[in-house]
Amino acid sequence: MVDQRHIRNFCIIAHIDHGKSTLADRLIEFTGVLTKREMTDQVLDNMELERERGITIKAQSVRMDYVADDGEQYVLNLIDTPGHVDFTYEVSRALAACEGALLVVDASQGIEAQTLANVYMALEHDLEIIPVINKIDLPAADPEKVKKEIEEVIGLDTSIAILASAKTGIGMKEILEAVVNFVPPPKGDRRAPLRALIYDSFYDSYKGVITYFRIFEGTVRKGDRIRFMATGKEFIVDELYIFRPGLTPVEELTAGEVGALAATIREVKHVRVGDTITLADNPAAEPLPGYRKATPMVFTGLYPVETNDYGRLRDALEKLQLNDASLSFEPETSEALGFGFRCGFLGLLHMDVIQERLEREFDLNLITTAPNVVYRVNMTSGEQIMIENPANWPDPSKIESVEEPVVRASIITPTEYVGPLMELCQDRRGTFLNMEYLNEKRVNLHYKLPLAEIMYDFFDQLKTRSRGYASFDYEVTGYEPSDMVKMDILVHGQPVDALSCIVHREKAQKLGRALVQKLRKLIPRHLFEVPIQAAVGNKILARENIAPLRKDVLAKCYGGDVTRKRKLLEKQKEGKKRMKAVGSVEIPQEAFMAVLSTDPDED
């Protein structure tokens, strides 16, 4: 049993690319958890996709033994956190499991938007924050400027800031000493009823769901009967583990320690991030605070290109759901695309990652429909309904008002790009809140934006207009009334359900025109004329025609009588008329993708 005074639980907070995973690698190597031979880059990012994109998606952990300068041996638990805004709830639970945090800032870049968001979250959890200025080996590094920025923007004392380079290994000992000296040891009575916070879980095909947790009070042993307080489910602990990146079995874990357990749990939905574990025969009176169910913010339809793959897609989604309880899906059918699923995600990166994993790990070809946010529709009858699929949009005459989700966005950018970025936010129906100067060269802009407007290519536009220098972070703040309408696309007079989208009334005309022009280029020509129309209700906003292909029926007439020619042309016209009445139009897959990339400013 480890003396509580010798345990330190900490995490690393950093913006993407500021060197968080590399720093974790160096600390693991420095404390000798893994030998040089066993080390791989980014030990804690085990998903191929995480390494490739350089992002951490699932929180991982490692336990390190370290003999400090005072001669005592300490147990340091590093809990790796995802840094991206979509996974904010996972970050908040991982932070709740710690007492301290290393704030890693790139010496050449300074503070970025996501760093700020996570620092404020760490301060809310009363964590002791140790600033680490990383990448000091870079020629462009300016540690003094970054120190000043940290002091001015966040208000942290940087006299204890550590200069480090995770790449070359400079400053690792200083970081570990700072963790021992500044991060407070965990508190908590080992004899009290068990209360442990779940901060992650993953599915193992042999052992079932493996639950990662941090114990706040009490003790858990192998063979105990445990209860999850949010779901009320009970299980018997088969095995307990600590992390030496891999799972290493132990007999018991007590207050202050971080570990994992296997209890033959078959479904990940029983294990919810943020829930409290207690003992069934001696339960705690109150769960730990802060648990909430993950609510999907973005919905999209996923359809297999080959209809026979429907079963495989369902199995793949079920497998992914085992590791990711925030993914929700239900079957849906579309006239244009056949059978598929309506999936809910935490945000756009989450959607992107899941889609890429489906295509890569399960070898599926997918068509995605345009992503939608959840609208709140107040009906004239007084009831309120939530709509995430344009197909379920009610009859306009029965709608009293519509509310859409809005976010508070924070954009950190060099001063010379403020103009183009403000213009971008105005275009996206943004409301300017305020702006603050971080130093003479960088500004933090605050905007209120509709979530639907940052869904498609806002991030790409942001990077384009700031030449890649701006960083962006947002939090959903609630719902606000908005004038939203459903826009249908009619091809050959028939509405195509998969192309319908919900847009703001003011933008409907512009978007409708851009969309029909795009579809005109993508839908192949037929033997009869095909009109493409964008409509809101009964009003047609834009129309384009696809000209028909025609056979030259006069080719064999040479000279000949004009009446003969006329007869052949009339006959052709009759045939076209009949064809137009019964013909069906092929819509290629690219046409569905066009909805995703329609930017009215392109043409």
Swiss-Prot record:
Bilayer topology term: Peripheral membrane protein
UniProt-listed GO biological process terms: positive regulation of translation
Pfam families, per the entry: EFG_C, GTP_EFTU, GTP_EFTU_D2, LepA_C
Subcellular location: Cell membrane
InterPro entries: EF-4, EFG_III/V, EFG_V-like, EFTu-like_2, G_TR_CS, LepA_C_sf, LepA_CTD, LepA_IV
Family the UniProt entry places it in: Belongs to the TRAFAC class translation factor GTPase superfamily. Classic translation factor GTPase family. LepA subfamily.
Classification via PANTHER family: TRANSLATION FACTOR GUF1 HOMOLOG, CHLOROPLASTIC, TRANSLATION FACTOR GUF1-RELATED
Protein name in the entry: Elongation factor 4
Source species taxonomy: Bacteria, Bacillati, Bacillota, Clostridia, Eubacteriales
Gene field: lepA
